[in-house]
Amino acid sequence: MTSLQSYSELELLNILISMCTSNKFPNVDNIFFQEGYRIVSIDRSVTTGSGSVKYDLVLSSQNKNLTLCFELKGLKASNISKEQLNRYKGLSTEEYIRLAGIQANNAINHKLQTIIGINLENLLKTEEYQVREGYNFPILSFGSQTISISFKELNDSEINQKLIKTVSTIGTPPTFIHFDKESRMSDLAYRAIPKIYSYAKVGTTMFTVEQIVNDVYCSVKELHSIIGPDVKKAVVNKIKSLLRQMSKEEFKDYLSWNGKDKCWVISKIHVESHHTTDFAFQKAGRNFIERLDKEIPFKIDKDVLQGQLSLFDELEPLDIN
């Protein structure tokens, strides 16, 4: 089995989250939780004197007076930016922990370290890039069998030793956050369509956008509140677009928008709906997802003139902070 595997940034994020949970999963060691780290933020922008800073994941330990900030570069790691790394290089620890709301026993002596997370196959070129451009960030590399630290040691000697010895990972870790800005519409549909069906089969024939976003986006409610609002807004907009398209295409007989109550209404499918009706709904789901995967064009909404709003544009605003 090769140790090389290309993970997306979202997959890298989920692997790291699994290393921070109280539950130890068979395929990933929860070393950050064991050492007292807790997740502070996920994809959240913080405006500092050196510009806007947005780490993919921020962990902090009050007992160790130390914060670890991860910049993840998935797949080919081709989006490493000098501007971004310069911002991290010149970041004031005291200013950042204050603006980010990080609890520190001693803010003056608190240490903050930026770590670049990449796929193992990109380790050599990332090391060469750092040498060439004058950066000195630790690199956390992810393979299908190992997770290891290189280039520079971490400020936390216990974590550093565990990572130098390598943390093993086999298979795919649990998924906590299911979407990000780069997720395809079909990724959302794979989770949203079965959820809509499950609503109806337990007697819930109306649902809000907020309800389905909460149910399909993030599996852990505690994490939902610390995800950056711009990322959540992008997911909300994709969910809205998905529901609109469903109601105009394969699901036009099953899904409609109730402008008065600001909710979506499920038709035909319910607790006692006939199995042939249920099968037809499920078939519509497969056809819809197949069209998304194959990028087959959908119909244009001819009822809305250019520059005008449709009734779907008045979907309820969500609290995404």
Where are these regions (language model features)?
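A short acidic, leucine-rich amphipathic alpha-helix
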Residues: 209-217, 223
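Acidic-basic catalytic patches of nuclease active cores, encompassing PD-(D/E)XK
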Residues: 1-52, 61-63, 95-100, 309-311, ...
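Short amphipathic alpha-helical interaction segments
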Residues: 224-247
